[in-house]
Amino acid sequence: MNKQNLIDVEGSVTESLPNGMFRVRLDNGCQVPTHISGKIRRNHVRILPGDRVKVELSPYDLTKGRIIYRLRNKSSNDWITS
């Protein structure tokens, strides 16, 4: 399947499930179980409940997704200036 055919939506992580799975509430209100993409797993990106993420869905199966990006929280202290 081409990358062009995939649907990108944003949502927030509501629950952490076993084996790198997460339950994500999408912006349209649906909840879908998702897994982490390979690049996120390889780079050890930490995803916690409450994080905003970008999810990729297949047009053939909208019941499962893949987390492809963790969005920065505006209130996080990732960038501390002195």
UniProtKB/Swiss-Prot annotation:
SUPFAM superfamilies: Nucleic acid-binding proteins
PROSITE patterns in alphabetical order: S1_IF1_TYPE
S1-like domain sequence ranges: 1-72
Localization (cell): Plastid, Chloroplast
Presence of keyword rRNA-binding: yes
GO molecular function annotations of the record: ribosome binding; rRNA binding; translation initiation factor activity
Keywords: Chloroplast, Initiation factor, Plastid, Protein biosynthesis, RNA-binding, rRNA-binding
Domain of life (superkingdom): Eukaryota
Annotated Gene Ontology cellular component terms: chloroplast; cytosol
Pfam family, one: eIF-1a
CDD domains: S1_IF1
Chief place where the protein resides: plastid
Subunit structure as annotated in this protein's UniProt entry: Component of the 30S ribosomal translation pre-initiation complex which assembles on the 30S ribosome in the order IF-2 and IF-3, IF-1 and N-formylmethionyl-tRNA(fMet); mRNA recruitment can occur at any time during PIC assembly.
Family: Belongs to the IF-1 family.
Biological role stated in the UniProt entry: One of the essential components for the initiation of protein synthesis. Stabilizes the binding of IF-2 and IF-3 on the 30S subunit to which N-formylmethionyl-tRNA(fMet) subsequently binds. Helps modulate mRNA selection, yielding the 30S pre-initiation complex (PIC). Upon addition of the 50S ribosomal subunit IF-1, IF-2 and IF-3 are released leaving the mature 70S translation initiation complex.
PANTHER family, sorted: TRANSLATION INITIATION FACTOR IF-1, CHLOROPLASTIC
Name of the protein in its database record: Translation initiation factor IF-1, chloroplastic
Species per Swiss-Prot/TrEMBL record: Cycas taitungensis (Prince sago)
